[in-house]
Amino acid sequence: MTKTPLYLLLICFMVLQLLAPGYLIFRNYDTLGTGESYKFNVRPYDPYDPFRGRYVALNANERTYYTYAVLERDAQGYAIISPFSSDRVPVSGVYAKNLKLDRYYMNESMAPIAERIQRSLSNDDIMYLLVKVKRGHYVIEGLYINDIPIEQYISHHH
């Protein structure tokens, strides 16, 4: 075999290796930019994982994992998962594939503060997770307290 076809094959593999993560990054940015927004009521707590560090674990008011979750909104504008969610692609409506909302990664020094803030919130304060959804793909945009991103809320209140 000549060296030219081997080089071409090697170049093709290199290009494919760049295209795969490039596509994943593009899909996430596309979902964040043009996806439909859904707010999920949550209550965080701060676990520690020696491999992942600190993060904010979330207790969603909804069940936290669905293969295909058909999303709707309640009267207050918060996301509810349709009782028709299943293991098959839905025929209509906005859906998220493999929806799992159980953690939100943030700066390690902020995670314990976020938990303390959550404990001190009054019943009038609102905490929610903002999720963008497009064609079955979802991306967590942020954790919010009273419509303020939690990172900004922490820096202004501590």
Task: Provide a role label for each language-model segment.
Residues 41-70:
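Short extracytoplasmic
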Residues 5-24:
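Hydrophobic membrane-insertion alpha-helices, especially the h-region
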Residues 79-158:
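Extracytoplasmic/periplasmic terminal helices and flexible tails
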Residues 27-45:
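Alpha-helical transmembrane signal-anchor/signal-peptide segments
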Residues 69-71, 78-80:
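Membrane-embedded segments
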Residues 35-37, 66, 76, 124-126:
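Extracytoplasmic
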Residues 41-43, 72-74, 132-134, 141:
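A structural detector for beta-sheet-dominated domains
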Residues 1-3:
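N-terminal hydrophobic targeting signals that begin at the initiator methionine
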